[in-house]
Swiss-Prot record:
It is found in: Cell membrane. Keywords: Cell membrane, Endonuclease, Hydrolase, Membrane, Nuclease, RNA-binding, Transmembrane, Transmembrane helix. GO terms for molecular function: RNA binding; RNA endonuclease activity. Belongs to the RNase Y family. This is Ribonuclease Y. Residues 207-273 form the KH domain. It comes from Campylobacter jejuni subsp. doylei (strain ATCC BAA-1458 / RM4099 / 269.97).
Length: 517
Protein backbone atom coordinates (compact mmCIF):
# COMPACT_ATOMS: atom_id res chain seq x y z
CA UNK A 1 0.00 0.00 0.00
CA UNK A 2 2.74 2.38 1.05
CA UNK A 3 4.66 1.41 -2.02
CA UNK A 4 1.70 2.17 -4.19
CA UNK A 5 1.30 5.54 -2.51
CA UNK A 6 4.98 6.28 -2.92
CA UNK A 7 4.74 5.33 -6.59
CA UNK A 8 1.72 7.59 -7.03
CA UNK A 9 3.46 10.51 -5.33
CA UNK A 10 6.53 9.88 -7.40
CA UNK A 11 4.39 9.91 -10.56
CA UNK A 12 2.69 13.14 -9.53
CA UNK A 13 6.01 14.75 -8.71
CA UNK A 14 7.38 13.51 -12.05
CA UNK A 15 4.44 15.00 -13.92
CA UNK A 16 4.87 18.28 -12.12
CA UNK A 17 8.54 18.41 -12.86
CA UNK A 18 7.82 17.48 -16.55
CA UNK A 19 5.20 20.22 -16.79
CA UNK A 20 7.61 22.81 -15.39
CA UNK A 21 10.38 21.70 -17.71
CA UNK A 22 8.03 21.77 -20.73
CA UNK A 23 6.68 25.19 -19.76
CA UNK A 24 10.17 26.58 -19.48
CA UNK A 25 11.10 25.17 -22.87
CA UNK A 26 7.94 26.69 -24.43
CA UNK A 27 8.66 30.03 -22.82
CA UNK A 28 12.15 29.99 -24.32
CA UNK A 29 10.74 29.19 -27.81
CA UNK A 30 8.19 31.99 -27.50
CA UNK A 31 10.88 34.48 -26.62
CA UNK A 32 12.92 33.35 -29.64
CA UNK A 33 9.81 33.70 -31.92
CA UNK A 34 9.12 37.17 -30.54
CA UNK A 35 12.69 38.23 -31.19
CA UNK A 36 12.53 36.88 -34.74
CA UNK A 37 9.25 38.72 -35.35
CA UNK A 38 10.74 41.94 -34.06
CA UNK A 39 13.76 41.48 -36.34
CA UNK A 40 11.47 40.90 -39.36
CA UNK A 41 9.39 43.93 -38.43
CA UNK A 42 12.51 46.07 -38.28
CA UNK A 43 13.63 44.70 -41.69
CA UNK A 44 10.21 45.47 -43.20
CA UNK A 45 10.24 48.92 -41.66
CA UNK A 46 13.69 49.53 -43.17
CA UNK A 47 12.57 48.34 -46.60
CA UNK A 48 9.49 50.57 -46.34
CA UNK A 49 11.71 53.53 -45.54
CA UNK A 50 13.84 52.74 -48.60
CA UNK A 51 10.75 52.44 -50.83
CA UNK A 52 9.36 55.68 -49.46
CA UNK A 53 12.67 57.35 -50.08
CA UNK A 54 12.76 56.03 -53.68
CA UNK A 55 9.17 57.19 -54.20
CA UNK A 56 10.02 60.65 -52.95
CA UNK A 57 13.03 60.76 -55.29
CA UNK A 58 10.87 59.61 -58.24
CA UNK A 59 8.23 62.23 -57.45
CA UNK A 60 10.89 64.86 -57.20
CA UNK A 61 12.43 63.80 -60.55
CA UNK A 62 8.98 63.75 -62.17
CA UNK A 63 8.25 67.21 -60.84
CA UNK A 64 11.56 68.44 -62.20
CA UNK A 65 10.87 66.81 -65.62
CA UNK A 66 7.38 68.29 -65.81
CA UNK A 67 8.69 71.65 -64.77
CA UNK A 68 11.40 71.43 -67.45
CA UNK A 69 8.91 70.47 -70.18
CA UNK A 70 6.55 73.20 -69.06
CA UNK A 71 9.33 75.75 -69.23
CA UNK A 72 10.37 74.50 -72.71
CA UNK A 73 6.79 74.59 -74.00
CA UNK A 74 6.25 78.02 -72.45
CA UNK A 75 9.42 79.23 -74.13
CA UNK A 76 8.34 77.80 -77.51
CA UNK A 77 4.89 79.36 -77.23
CA UNK A 78 6.44 82.67 -76.28
CA UNK A 79 8.82 82.40 -79.24
CA UNK A 80 5.97 81.60 -81.66
CA UNK A 81 3.94 84.42 -80.22
CA UNK A 82 6.82 86.85 -80.68
CA UNK A 83 7.31 85.60 -84.26
CA UNK A 84 3.64 86.05 -85.09
CA UNK A 85 3.70 89.43 -83.43
CA UNK A 86 6.64 90.43 -85.65
CA UNK A 87 4.79 89.13 -88.73
CA UNK A 88 1.70 91.10 -87.80
CA UNK A 89 3.80 94.17 -87.27
CA UNK A 90 5.43 93.75 -90.69
CA UNK A 91 2.03 93.20 -92.34
CA UNK A 92 0.69 96.27 -90.61
CA UNK A 93 3.62 98.28 -91.91
CA UNK A 94 3.05 96.87 -95.42
CA UNK A 95 -0.65 97.73 -95.25
CA UNK A 96 0.21 101.24 -94.14
CA UNK A 97 2.60 101.58 -97.08
CA UNK A 98 -0.03 100.27 -99.49
CA UNK A 99 -2.60 102.61 -98.00
CA UNK A 100 -0.25 105.54 -98.50
CA UNK A 101 0.38 104.39 -102.07
CA UNK A 102 -3.37 104.15 -102.70
CA UNK A 103 -3.79 107.67 -101.38
CA UNK A 104 -1.07 108.87 -103.73
CA UNK A 105 -2.68 107.01 -106.65
CA UNK A 106 -6.05 108.48 -105.77
CA UNK A 107 -4.59 111.98 -105.72
CA UNK A 108 -2.90 111.29 -109.06
CA UNK A 109 -6.17 110.00 -110.54
CA UNK A 110 -8.03 113.07 -109.30
CA UNK A 111 -5.42 115.32 -110.90
CA UNK A 112 -5.53 113.24 -114.11
CA UNK A 113 -9.31 113.36 -114.19
CA UNK A 114 -9.24 117.13 -113.76
CA UNK A 115 -6.64 117.37 -116.52
CA UNK A 116 -8.81 115.19 -118.80
CA UNK A 117 -11.81 117.36 -118.07
CA UNK A 118 -9.77 120.43 -118.98
CA UNK A 119 -8.63 118.74 -122.20
CA UNK A 120 -12.21 117.68 -122.99
CA UNK A 121 -13.30 121.27 -122.53
CA UNK A 122 -10.56 122.41 -124.92
CA UNK A 123 -11.60 119.72 -127.43
CA UNK A 124 -15.22 120.83 -127.26
CA UNK A 125 -14.15 124.39 -127.91
CA UNK A 126 -12.06 123.24 -130.89
CA UNK A 127 -14.99 121.19 -132.21
CA UNK A 128 -17.24 124.20 -132.02
CA UNK A 129 -14.68 126.33 -133.84
CA UNK A 130 -14.22 123.55 -136.45
CA UNK A 131 -17.96 123.28 -136.96
CA UNK A 132 -18.23 127.05 -137.39
CA UNK A 133 -15.41 127.00 -139.95
CA UNK A 134 -17.00 123.99 -141.71
CA UNK A 135 -20.33 125.77 -141.91
CA UNK A 136 -18.61 128.80 -143.39
CA UNK A 137 -16.81 126.60 -145.94
CA UNK A 138 -20.04 124.81 -146.87
CA UNK A 139 -21.81 128.12 -147.35
CA UNK A 140 -18.99 129.30 -149.61
CA UNK A 141 -19.08 125.96 -151.55
CA UNK A 142 -22.85 126.09 -151.92
CA UNK A 143 -22.59 129.65 -153.14
CA UNK A 144 -19.76 128.88 -155.59
CA UNK A 145 -20.97 125.47 -156.92
CA UNK A 146 -24.66 126.16 -156.51
CA UNK A 147 -25.05 122.67 -154.83
CA UNK A 148 -26.76 121.97 -151.56
CA UNK A 149 -24.96 120.21 -148.75
CA UNK A 150 -26.85 116.92 -149.33
CA UNK A 151 -26.11 116.99 -153.07
CA UNK A 152 -22.40 117.55 -152.46
CA UNK A 153 -22.40 114.76 -149.87
CA UNK A 154 -24.01 112.32 -152.34
CA UNK A 155 -21.42 113.15 -155.03
CA UNK A 156 -18.54 112.63 -152.59
CA UNK A 157 -19.99 109.38 -151.20
CA UNK A 158 -20.59 108.02 -154.70
CA UNK A 159 -17.01 108.76 -155.70
CA UNK A 160 -15.69 107.18 -152.50
CA UNK A 161 -17.90 104.12 -153.04
CA UNK A 162 -16.60 103.62 -156.59
CA UNK A 163 -12.99 103.88 -155.48
CA UNK A 164 -13.63 101.59 -152.51
CA UNK A 165 -15.39 98.97 -154.65
CA UNK A 166 -12.40 98.72 -156.98
CA UNK A 167 -10.03 98.39 -154.03
CA UNK A 168 -12.26 95.82 -152.30
CA UNK A 169 -12.57 93.74 -155.51
CA UNK A 170 -8.80 93.79 -155.90
CA UNK A 171 -8.30 92.74 -152.26
CA UNK A 172 -10.95 89.99 -152.54
CA UNK A 173 -9.33 88.56 -155.69
CA UNK A 174 -5.95 88.68 -154.03
CA UNK A 175 -7.06 86.89 -150.86
CA UNK A 176 -9.22 84.43 -152.78
CA UNK A 177 -6.24 83.41 -154.88
CA UNK A 178 -4.05 83.19 -151.78
CA UNK A 179 -6.71 81.09 -150.00
CA UNK A 180 -6.95 78.68 -152.95
CA UNK A 181 -3.18 78.33 -153.15
CA UNK A 182 -2.97 77.80 -149.39
CA UNK A 183 -5.81 75.24 -149.45
CA UNK A 184 -4.13 73.37 -152.30
CA UNK A 185 -0.78 73.47 -150.53
CA UNK A 186 -2.37 72.28 -147.26
CA UNK A 187 -4.25 69.48 -149.04
CA UNK A 188 -1.07 68.31 -150.78
CA UNK A 189 0.78 68.46 -147.46
CA UNK A 190 -1.90 66.40 -145.68
CA UNK A 191 -1.99 63.79 -148.46
CA UNK A 192 1.82 63.63 -148.48
CA UNK A 193 1.84 63.26 -144.69
CA UNK A 194 -0.80 60.52 -144.79
CA UNK A 195 0.81 58.51 -147.58
CA UNK A 196 4.29 58.83 -146.07
CA UNK A 197 3.11 57.71 -142.62
CA UNK A 198 1.24 54.67 -143.92
CA UNK A 199 2.84 51.88 -145.90
CA UNK A 200 0.19 49.39 -147.00
CA UNK A 201 0.82 45.97 -148.43
CA UNK A 202 0.26 45.36 -152.13
CA UNK A 203 -2.69 42.98 -152.40
CA UNK A 204 -3.81 41.81 -155.83
CA UNK A 205 -5.99 38.70 -155.90
CA UNK A 206 -5.54 35.85 -158.37
CA UNK A 207 -8.20 33.53 -159.74
CA UNK A 208 -6.38 30.26 -159.01
CA UNK A 209 -4.80 28.45 -156.08
CA UNK A 210 -2.07 25.85 -156.60
CA UNK A 211 -2.02 22.85 -154.24
CA UNK A 212 1.32 21.06 -154.01
CA UNK A 213 1.18 17.27 -153.68
CA UNK A 214 3.95 14.80 -152.85
CA UNK A 215 3.53 12.58 -155.90
CA UNK A 216 1.40 12.38 -159.03
CA UNK A 217 -0.25 9.11 -157.90
CA UNK A 218 -2.53 11.22 -155.71
CA UNK A 219 -3.94 12.86 -158.86
CA UNK A 220 -5.51 9.54 -159.87
CA UNK A 221 -7.06 9.10 -156.42
CA UNK A 222 -8.46 12.63 -156.53
CA UNK A 223 -9.98 11.99 -159.97
CA UNK A 224 -11.44 8.69 -158.76
CA UNK A 225 -13.08 5.90 -160.69
CA UNK A 226 -14.62 7.33 -163.88
CA UNK A 227 -13.96 10.81 -162.49
CA UNK A 228 -16.44 10.32 -159.63
CA UNK A 229 -14.33 12.03 -156.95
CA UNK A 230 -13.39 15.10 -158.99
CA UNK A 231 -17.01 15.57 -160.13
CA UNK A 232 -18.19 15.39 -156.51
CA UNK A 233 -15.49 17.89 -155.50
CA UNK A 234 -16.50 20.35 -158.22
CA UNK A 235 -20.21 19.99 -157.43
CA UNK A 236 -19.86 20.30 -153.65
CA UNK A 237 -17.17 23.01 -153.67
CA UNK A 238 -18.40 25.02 -156.68
CA UNK A 239 -14.93 25.39 -158.23
CA UNK A 240 -12.94 24.18 -161.22
CA UNK A 241 -10.32 21.55 -160.37
CA UNK A 242 -7.63 21.38 -163.04
CA UNK A 243 -5.48 18.25 -162.98
CA UNK A 244 -3.00 18.31 -165.87
CA UNK A 245 0.59 17.30 -166.59
CA UNK A 246 2.02 19.90 -164.21
CA UNK A 247 4.15 17.80 -161.83
CA UNK A 248 3.24 17.86 -158.14
CA UNK A 249 0.43 20.39 -158.51
CA UNK A 250 -3.38 20.57 -158.57
CA UNK A 251 -4.98 23.86 -159.63
CA UNK A 252 -8.19 25.18 -158.04
CA UNK A 253 -9.85 27.89 -160.15
CA UNK A 254 -12.79 30.08 -159.09
CA UNK A 255 -13.61 33.81 -159.19
CA UNK A 256 -15.10 33.57 -155.66
CA UNK A 257 -12.24 33.86 -153.16
CA UNK A 258 -14.24 32.31 -150.33
CA UNK A 259 -15.22 29.19 -152.27
CA UNK A 260 -11.69 28.87 -153.64
CA UNK A 261 -10.14 29.10 -150.15
CA UNK A 262 -12.55 26.47 -148.77
CA UNK A 263 -11.91 24.18 -151.76
CA UNK A 264 -8.14 24.50 -151.31
CA UNK A 265 -8.38 23.60 -147.61
CA UNK A 266 -10.74 20.65 -148.29
CA UNK A 267 -8.44 19.15 -150.94
CA UNK A 268 -5.36 19.62 -148.73
CA UNK A 269 -7.11 17.78 -145.86
CA UNK A 270 -8.26 14.99 -148.18
CA UNK A 271 -4.74 14.54 -149.56
CA UNK A 272 -3.34 14.49 -146.02
CA UNK A 273 -6.03 12.05 -144.81
CA UNK A 274 -5.78 9.72 -147.81
CA UNK A 275 -9.47 8.72 -147.75
CA UNK A 276 -10.83 10.36 -150.90
CA UNK A 277 -14.45 9.39 -151.59
CA UNK A 278 -17.75 11.30 -152.06
CA UNK A 279 -19.03 10.79 -148.50
CA UNK A 280 -15.69 11.86 -147.01
CA UNK A 281 -15.57 14.90 -149.31
CA UNK A 282 -18.93 16.17 -147.99
CA UNK A 283 -17.89 15.48 -144.38
CA UNK A 284 -14.61 17.40 -144.74
CA UNK A 285 -16.40 20.24 -146.59
CA UNK A 286 -18.89 20.69 -143.73
CA UNK A 287 -16.07 20.67 -141.17
CA UNK A 288 -13.99 23.23 -143.10
CA UNK A 289 -17.00 25.54 -143.54
CA UNK A 290 -17.45 25.64 -139.75
CA UNK A 291 -13.73 26.30 -139.24
CA UNK A 292 -13.85 29.15 -141.77
CA UNK A 293 -16.83 30.73 -139.97
CA UNK A 294 -14.81 30.79 -136.74
CA UNK A 295 -11.69 32.02 -138.54
CA UNK A 296 -13.63 34.86 -140.19
CA UNK A 297 -14.95 36.06 -136.82
CA UNK A 298 -11.46 35.84 -135.30
CA UNK A 299 -10.00 37.77 -138.27
CA UNK A 300 -12.60 40.51 -137.77
CA UNK A 301 -11.88 40.73 -134.04
CA UNK A 302 -8.12 41.09 -134.71
CA UNK A 303 -8.74 43.90 -137.23
CA UNK A 304 -11.08 45.75 -134.83
CA UNK A 305 -8.58 45.41 -131.97
CA UNK A 306 -5.63 46.56 -134.13
CA UNK A 307 -7.58 49.68 -135.17
CA UNK A 308 -8.48 50.46 -131.54
CA UNK A 309 -12.24 50.38 -132.16
CA UNK A 310 -14.92 49.38 -129.65
CA UNK A 311 -18.64 48.68 -129.38
CA UNK A 312 -18.95 47.10 -132.84
CA UNK A 313 -21.75 44.56 -133.24
CA UNK A 314 -20.48 40.95 -133.58
CA UNK A 315 -22.31 40.54 -136.91
CA UNK A 316 -20.41 43.53 -138.34
CA UNK A 317 -17.15 42.15 -136.92
CA UNK A 318 -17.81 38.86 -138.73
CA UNK A 319 -18.50 40.70 -142.00
CA UNK A 320 -15.23 42.64 -141.61
CA UNK A 321 -13.42 39.29 -141.48
CA UNK A 322 -15.41 38.12 -144.52
CA UNK A 323 -14.02 41.03 -146.57
CA UNK A 324 -10.78 39.01 -146.68
CA UNK A 325 -12.53 36.81 -149.25
CA UNK A 326 -13.88 39.63 -151.42
CA UNK A 327 -12.10 41.55 -154.17
CA UNK A 328 -12.81 44.68 -156.19
CA UNK A 329 -10.95 45.31 -159.44
CA UNK A 330 -8.46 42.66 -158.34
CA UNK A 331 -7.80 44.49 -155.04
CA UNK A 332 -8.51 42.57 -151.83
CA UNK A 333 -11.48 44.25 -150.10
CA UNK A 334 -10.12 43.82 -146.56
CA UNK A 335 -6.67 45.12 -147.49
CA UNK A 336 -8.31 48.08 -149.25
CA UNK A 337 -10.58 48.82 -146.25
CA UNK A 338 -7.64 48.64 -143.84
CA UNK A 339 -5.65 50.99 -146.05
CA UNK A 340 -8.58 53.43 -146.20
CA UNK A 341 -9.05 53.22 -142.39
CA UNK A 342 -5.41 54.10 -141.66
CA UNK A 343 -5.23 56.86 -144.29
CA UNK A 344 -8.57 58.36 -143.20
CA UNK A 345 -7.44 58.41 -139.56
CA UNK A 346 -4.22 60.23 -140.45
CA UNK A 347 -5.99 62.74 -142.73
CA UNK A 348 -8.72 63.43 -140.13
CA UNK A 349 -6.11 63.96 -137.40
CA UNK A 350 -4.20 66.42 -139.61
CA UNK A 351 -7.45 68.34 -140.28
CA UNK A 352 -8.51 68.46 -136.61
CA UNK A 353 -11.15 65.70 -136.86
CA UNK A 354 -11.81 62.58 -134.79
CA UNK A 355 -9.10 60.10 -135.80
CA UNK A 356 -10.80 57.09 -134.18
CA UNK A 357 -14.17 57.83 -135.83
CA UNK A 358 -12.46 58.27 -139.21
CA UNK A 359 -10.78 54.85 -138.85
CA UNK A 360 -14.16 53.33 -137.93
CA UNK A 361 -15.82 54.85 -141.01
CA UNK A 362 -12.85 53.78 -143.16
CA UNK A 363 -12.98 50.09 -142.21
CA UNK A 364 -16.78 50.02 -142.68
CA UNK A 365 -17.07 52.10 -145.88
CA UNK A 366 -17.10 48.96 -148.10
CA UNK A 367 -18.74 46.57 -145.60
CA UNK A 368 -21.60 46.05 -148.08
CA UNK A 369 -19.19 44.12 -150.34
CA UNK A 370 -19.32 41.27 -147.82
CA UNK A 371 -23.08 40.97 -148.54
CA UNK A 372 -23.29 41.42 -152.33
CA UNK A 373 -22.94 37.67 -153.01
CA UNK A 374 -25.90 36.86 -150.74
CA UNK A 375 -28.27 39.85 -151.14
CA UNK A 376 -29.51 42.01 -153.99
CA UNK A 377 -28.51 45.66 -154.17
CA UNK A 378 -25.39 47.78 -154.41
CA UNK A 379 -22.71 47.45 -151.76
CA UNK A 380 -23.34 51.10 -150.78
CA UNK A 381 -27.04 50.56 -149.98
CA UNK A 382 -26.39 47.19 -148.31
CA UNK A 383 -23.59 48.62 -146.14
CA UNK A 384 -25.57 51.71 -145.10
CA UNK A 385 -28.63 49.61 -144.26
CA UNK A 386 -26.51 47.21 -142.18
CA UNK A 387 -24.80 50.01 -140.21
CA UNK A 388 -28.14 51.75 -139.67
CA UNK A 389 -29.65 48.51 -138.34
CA UNK A 390 -26.85 48.06 -135.80
CA UNK A 391 -26.94 51.75 -134.67
CA UNK A 392 -23.59 52.82 -136.11
CA UNK A 393 -22.53 56.49 -135.87
CA UNK A 394 -24.23 58.80 -138.46
CA UNK A 395 -20.77 59.82 -139.72
CA UNK A 396 -20.08 56.18 -140.65
CA UNK A 397 -23.33 55.96 -142.64
CA UNK A 398 -22.63 59.31 -144.34
CA UNK A 399 -19.12 58.10 -145.29
CA UNK A 400 -20.58 54.93 -146.87
CA UNK A 401 -22.90 57.01 -149.06
CA UNK A 402 -20.39 59.81 -149.72
CA UNK A 403 -17.46 57.72 -150.96
CA UNK A 404 -19.47 56.89 -154.11
CA UNK A 405 -21.08 60.33 -154.42
CA UNK A 406 -24.56 59.28 -153.24
CA UNK A 407 -24.44 62.05 -150.61
CA UNK A 408 -22.29 65.06 -149.79
CA UNK A 409 -19.69 64.51 -147.06
CA UNK A 410 -21.05 66.30 -143.97
CA UNK A 411 -18.01 66.01 -141.69
CA UNK A 412 -14.22 66.04 -141.68
CA UNK A 413 -14.22 62.28 -141.05
CA UNK A 414 -16.48 61.51 -144.05
CA UNK A 415 -14.37 63.72 -146.32
CA UNK A 416 -11.22 61.98 -145.02
CA UNK A 417 -12.71 58.56 -145.91
CA UNK A 418 -13.56 59.77 -149.44
CA UNK A 419 -10.02 61.09 -149.93
CA UNK A 420 -8.46 57.91 -148.50
CA UNK A 421 -10.68 55.71 -150.73
CA UNK A 422 -9.57 57.65 -153.80
CA UNK A 423 -5.90 57.43 -152.75
CA UNK A 424 -6.12 53.68 -152.17
CA UNK A 425 -7.94 52.99 -155.44
CA UNK A 426 -5.74 55.31 -157.52
CA UNK A 427 -2.47 53.84 -156.29
CA UNK A 428 -0.56 52.42 -159.30
CA UNK A 429 -1.17 48.68 -159.58
CA UNK A 430 -3.90 48.62 -156.93
CA UNK A 431 -6.72 47.62 -159.29
CA UNK A 432 -7.27 45.80 -162.57
CA UNK A 433 -10.29 46.88 -164.64
CA UNK A 434 -10.32 43.84 -166.99
CA UNK A 435 -10.38 41.40 -164.08
CA UNK A 436 -13.25 43.30 -162.44
CA UNK A 437 -15.28 43.16 -165.66
CA UNK A 438 -14.77 39.37 -165.78
CA UNK A 439 -15.77 38.94 -162.12
CA UNK A 440 -18.88 41.05 -162.70
CA UNK A 441 -19.86 38.89 -165.68
CA UNK A 442 -19.53 35.57 -163.83
CA UNK A 443 -21.37 37.00 -160.79
CA UNK A 444 -24.23 38.09 -163.07
CA UNK A 445 -24.23 34.60 -164.57
CA UNK A 446 -24.72 33.02 -161.12
CA UNK A 447 -27.39 35.59 -160.17
CA UNK A 448 -29.48 34.72 -163.26
CA UNK A 449 -29.39 31.03 -162.36
CA UNK A 450 -30.16 31.60 -158.65
CA UNK A 451 -33.18 33.77 -159.49
CA UNK A 452 -35.10 30.72 -160.74
CA UNK A 453 -37.39 28.80 -158.39
CA UNK A 454 -36.18 25.41 -157.19
CA UNK A 455 -32.45 26.21 -157.47
CA UNK A 456 -30.28 25.36 -154.44
CA UNK A 457 -27.04 26.84 -155.73
CA UNK A 458 -25.19 27.85 -158.88
CA UNK A 459 -21.48 28.01 -159.71
CA UNK A 460 -19.83 29.65 -162.71
CA UNK A 461 -16.84 27.53 -163.75
CA UNK A 462 -14.40 27.15 -166.66
CA UNK A 463 -13.67 30.89 -166.72
CA UNK A 464 -17.37 31.68 -167.08
CA UNK A 465 -17.91 29.37 -170.05
CA UNK A 466 -20.08 26.99 -167.98
CA UNK A 467 -22.71 27.50 -165.30
CA UNK A 468 -23.28 24.49 -163.04
CA UNK A 469 -26.71 24.61 -161.36
CA UNK A 470 -27.71 22.41 -158.41
CA UNK A 471 -31.50 21.87 -158.49
CA UNK A 472 -33.66 20.88 -155.51
CA UNK A 473 -34.86 17.35 -156.27
CA UNK A 474 -37.99 17.89 -154.13
CA UNK A 475 -39.13 20.87 -156.25
CA UNK A 476 -37.76 20.08 -159.73
CA UNK A 477 -38.26 16.80 -161.60
CA UNK A 478 -36.25 15.50 -164.56
CA UNK A 479 -38.50 17.05 -167.21
CA UNK A 480 -38.49 20.40 -165.44
CA UNK A 481 -34.67 20.27 -165.28
CA UNK A 482 -34.54 20.28 -169.09
CA UNK A 483 -36.96 23.22 -169.30
CA UNK A 484 -35.04 25.04 -166.56
CA UNK A 485 -31.77 24.70 -168.48
CA UNK A 486 -33.44 26.11 -171.62
CA UNK A 487 -34.98 29.06 -169.71
CA UNK A 488 -31.69 29.98 -168.05
CA UNK A 489 -29.79 29.68 -171.34
CA UNK A 490 -32.36 31.93 -173.07
CA UNK A 491 -32.17 34.55 -170.30
CA UNK A 492 -28.35 34.54 -170.37
CA UNK A 493 -28.43 34.97 -174.14
CA UNK A 494 -30.89 37.87 -173.82
CA UNK A 495 -29.31 39.79 -170.93
CA UNK A 496 -25.56 39.20 -171.24
CA UNK A 497 -22.82 39.89 -173.74
CA UNK A 498 -20.06 37.27 -173.95
CA UNK A 499 -17.67 35.71 -176.46
CA UNK A 500 -18.34 32.16 -177.71
CA UNK A 501 -20.95 30.13 -175.84
CA UNK A 502 -21.90 29.29 -172.26
CA UNK A 503 -22.82 25.77 -171.19
CA UNK A 504 -25.81 25.55 -168.82
CA UNK A 505 -25.51 22.37 -166.76
CA UNK A 506 -28.48 21.57 -164.45
CA UNK A 507 -27.76 18.79 -161.94
CA UNK A 508 -30.59 17.11 -160.04
CA UNK A 509 -29.70 14.55 -157.39
CA UNK A 510 -32.18 12.79 -155.14
CA UNK A 511 -30.88 11.27 -151.92
CA UNK A 512 -33.02 9.00 -149.76
CA UNK A 513 -31.66 8.56 -146.23
CA UNK A 514 -33.10 6.31 -143.55
CA UNK A 515 -31.67 4.93 -140.30
CA UNK A 516 -32.03 1.33 -139.06
CA UNK A 517 -32.71 1.33 -135.31
Amino acid sequence: MIESLIALIAAIVGLGIGYLVAKKINDAKYEIFVEQAKAKAKAIEYEAELILKDAKNSILNAELEVKKKYEEKTHKIQKDFNQKLDDLFKKEQKLQQEEEKLKEDKEYLCKSQKHIQDLQSDVDKLKNKYQEKLDDVLKILEHSTRLTQNEAKEIILKKVEENSREQIAHIVRKYEEEAKNEAKRKANFIIAQATSRFAGEFAAERLINVINIKNDELKGRIIGKEGRNVKTLEMVLGVDIIIDDTPGAIIVSCFNLYRRAIATKVIELLVEDGRIQPARIEEIHEKVCKEFDSAILEEGEIIVMDLGLNKIHPEIVKLIGKLKYRASYGQNALAHSLEVAHLAGIIAAECGGDENLARRAGILHDIGKALTHDFEGSHVDLGAELCNRYKEHPVVINAIYAHHGHEEATSIESAAVCAADTLSAARPGARREVLEAFLKRVSELEDIAKSKEGIKNAYAINAGREIRIIANAQLVNDDESVLLAKEIAAEIQEKMQYPGEIKVNVIRELRAIEYAK
